[in-house]
From Swiss-Prot:
Its EC number is 1.-.-.-. The gene is dfa4. It comes from Nostoc sp. (strain PCC 7120 / SAG 25.82 / UTEX 2576). SMART domains: Flavin_Reduct, Lactamase_B. This is Putative diflavin flavoprotein A 4. Pfam families: Flavin_Reduct, Flavodoxin_1, ODP.
């Protein structure tokens, strides 16, 4: 497997994957966007497919990032004037840019999509109305030579216009946002599929965990098709692990639904910005073992919203501001919350706006006036979110989850005898001491720092350390092989720890008042530390509520020869 590197330019890889069928993989070896789903920084591919039978169909052209190189490469394999159909698994503003260029070259082509996608396209491009054909579940399009395409609608809150396409000739199911992974490599198929597990699971958690119910419904629709390959919108074509990957999706959905705590995430998104915020908050919740029921209020009816609100443990509402007001769907959802949700439920508010944010203020004030407690500071974002804002959203989701867990623990009746035993055990475990350290990481140009004492030397040759990190402590920046960090071992008598003693969730910069220098691996060295180690992650293991990381020490230096290591003394092993 060739892992993404930033030294290669973007390109389009073309190959045969079946009879009369080509894949065109628009590839970037760098992080494509700043959304949470791309944060593992393994690059990505935007997969498009061309079926050339008696009639020709192009499936899922990529977004604006690849428009020019994609169309240039496509022209080597297709006379645009002979293209009959363009099939869309979903529609968004990014993809519309490519569609405009493509339709100017192929004005005779018909756009095939779901009904919600057709409505969106007709609104954005009224002049296209005669060229758009909406399809329903199990509609069939015959391209000739055995290529009968069956369409399977797969709506979800994030992609209400989702559409699968199944080709009976090649038995390929084109799955768009399902069964993908953000990873760029030369391999077309999933021969080495076991090494893809981490990327696949992360992709699912980011995109589908908050909509597990709808994902299961989509899986039920395709199970009878008998597909032999999945052709996703991102990552390798699934041929060798199809049964296992399908099973994984069902298990991951069940895992979400079986969580003890459940949050209703209610939102609408006018231009996509509020939806991006919702996805980042959901990721913070999912990473902290909370089930998220994502509800796009533009699609859900009042009965469904009422049922979800009544059954959840916490409610988070997101809204854009349109003309100084919240959309009607959000006003309806807010009314349901205020009239049916117990006041003991934790709440949260977020939203995006252009010139004013009245909708966000309205929701916040209504919830506060009704005596709901907010689980994080209300998030207000003007225009498009930045990477820093998305990190704040993810941290807000983590904070919300931890507060829910604490609330549940307070409400749980205690049994006297087992509790006494637990207390004694916790007290004993708490006597384990560790060196106080600050771990510094880097996410592109953003530096992070966390305080920990859960570190020990693990190996002598090569020198290596073992460290336990909670998910909410930016564990994603150290969760895969090759990630680098600096372990700053603190010196007794210095007060460096106070800058890192609480989780920074709203953009605080703990390094602003500290002297630092940059290590060879790009992370920060605290010059007031006793010593530092530059480390590279080589192995990881999920253990309970922590990620256990083994890292090899690349280099290190003692900064204060006469200093003594700062040590944390605890009285309980529960924190």
């Amino acid at each position: 497997m060739t892992i993404a590197t930033s030294s290669r330019p973007r390109d389009v890889q073309v190959a045969d994957i079946g009879e009369h069928t080509l894949i065109l993989r628009s590839r970037t070896w760098e992080r494509l966007k700043f959304e949470v789903e791309y944060s593992r920084q393994r690059g990505t591919t935007a997969n498009s497919y061309l079926i050339q039978a008696d009639k020709k169909a192009l499936i899922d052209p990529p977004g604006e990032s690849f428009t020019a190189i994609y169309l240039e490469q496509l022209a080597q394999y297709l006379d645009f004037t002979t293209l009959d159909y363009i099939i869309l698994g979903h529609v968004n503003p990014n993809r519309r840019v490519t569609l405009q260029e493509l339709l100017s070259k192929a004005p005779q082509a018909t756009l095939i999509c779901s009904r919600p996608a057709a409505n969106a396209l007709k609104t954005a491009f009224p002049e296209w109305e005669s060229r758009i054909q909406a399809v329903r579940f199990e509609d069939i399009l015959d391209l000739g030579q055995g290529h009968q395409l069956t369409f399977v609608t797969a709506p979800t809150p994030r992609w209400p216009d989702g559409l699968f396409t199944y080709d009976s000739a090649t038995k390929i199911l084109y799955t768009d946002k399902f069964f993908g992974a953000h990873i760029c490599e030369d391999t077309l198929f999933d021969e080495d599929w076991k090494k893809l597990d981490a990327e696949r699971h992360y992709y699912f958690d980011c995109l589908h965990a908050p909509q597990a119910k709808q994902v299961e419904a989509a899986l039920d629709k395709v199970v009878m098709l008998g597909a032999r390959s999945y052709a996703p919108g991102h990552g390798p074509v699934v041929r060798y692990s199809l049964s296992r990957f399908t099973y994984d999706y069902r298990q991951w959905c069940q895992g979400q639904k079986s969580q003890d705590l459940n949050v209703a995430l209610l939102y609408t998104s006018a231009y996509g910005n509020t939806g991006i915020l919702a996805n980042a908050i959901a990721q913070g919740l999912v990473q902290n073992d909370v089930n998220v029921q994502s509800v796009n209020c533009e699609l859900a009816d009042t009965a469904e919203i009422t049922r979800i609100v009544e059954a959840c443990d916490g409610i988070i509402i997101g809204s854009p501001t349109l003309g100084g007001h919240a959309p009607t769907q959000i006003q309806t959802a807010l009314g349901i919350v205020l009239s049916t949700a117990a006041k003991t439920k934790l709440a949260g508010v977020f939203g995006s706006y252009g010139w004013s944010g009245e909708a966000i203020d309205l929701i916040e004030s209504k919830l506060k006036d009704a005596n709901y407690r907010l689980g994080f500071d209300t998030i207000r974002v003007r225009f498009s979110p930045t990477p820093e804002i998305l990190q704040q959203c993810q941290a807000a989701g983590a904070t919300f989850a931890q507060t829910l867990k604490k609330n549940k623990k307070l409400r749980t009746p205690r049994q006297v005898i087992p509790e006494a035993k637990i207390d004694r055990t916790e007290q004993a475990v708490g006597r384990i001491i560790g060196s106080l350290c600050v771990v510094t990481t880097r996410d592109q140009e953003s530096h992070k720092g966390i305080l920990t004492s859960w570190v020990s030397q693990a190996t002598f040759n090569p020198p290596g350390i073992m460290m336990a990190i909670a998910q909410e402590q930016n564990a994603d920046l150290m969760s895969h092989t090759g990630d680098q960090f600096v372990l700053n071992i603190l010196k007794e008598g210095r007060n460096v720890r106070r800058y890192f003693s609480r989780q920074s969730t709203l953009g605080d910069n703990p390094f602003a008042n500290l002297k630092t220098k940059t290590a060879d691996n790009g992370c920060l060295i605290l010059t007031e530390a006793l010593a530092y180690l530059e480390c590279t992650v080589t192995n990881q293991l999920e253990c309970g509520d922590r990620l256990l990381i083994y890292a090899v020490v690349d280099k290190g230096e003692v900064l204060a020869n006469d200093g003594v290591t700062a040590v944390e003394h605890r009285k309980s092993g529960s924190h």
